[in-house]
A protein has these predicted regions:
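A short beta-strand micro-motif common to beta-rich folds, especially ectodomain repeats
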Residues: 89-93
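Contiguous, often N-terminal, cationic amphipathic patches that form binding interfaces
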Residues: 1-76, 82, 87, 103-109, ...
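Conserved amphipathic alpha-helical interaction elements at protein-protein interfaces in regulatory
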Residues: 78, 95, 99-100
């Protein structure tokens, strides 16, 4: 289990990267225009919409020098501005993750893997 950790005057706090990814994914799903996280099948190159339980597979968390970098692989709604959706996602996730973890979010990369028409 990879973990992001920080030292405090009372001891060490370790937060699993999986927990950070889950929190970031939940925050992302609250953003307008995000349909879900994308999982890529390396074998055949197909992109699939991940279920809520496995959405962390569409998010990669990296910690370097006490700063977080996140890679999101997302599917967006048809007809929305991808730039507006990405800006909203970055702002929301950065703010909420910094409040949640106490770590600085240095960079959020967004990879739009698909578009889905919502009924």
């Amino acid at each position: 289990m990879k973990a992001s950790s920080m030292d405090t005057h009372m001891g060490n706090i370790a937060i699993s990267n999986e927990v950070i990814a889950q929190y970031a994914g939940t925050t992302a799903m609250e953003c307008f225009g995000i349909v879900g996280m994308a999982g890529m099948s390396v074998k055949d190159g197909f992109v699939k919409l991940l279920k809520k339980e496995s959405m962390t597979r569409g998010i990669q968390v990296t910690l370097k020098n006490h700063k977080l970098t996140l890679d999101f692989h997302v599917i967006v709604s048809y007809g929305v501005s991808i730039l507006a959706v990405a800006d909203n996602l970055i702002d929301s996730v950065k703010y909420k993750l910094e409040e949640f973890t106490g770590l600085e979010v240095e960079k959020i990369n967004i990879y739009v893997e698909g578009v889905k028409v919502i009924d």
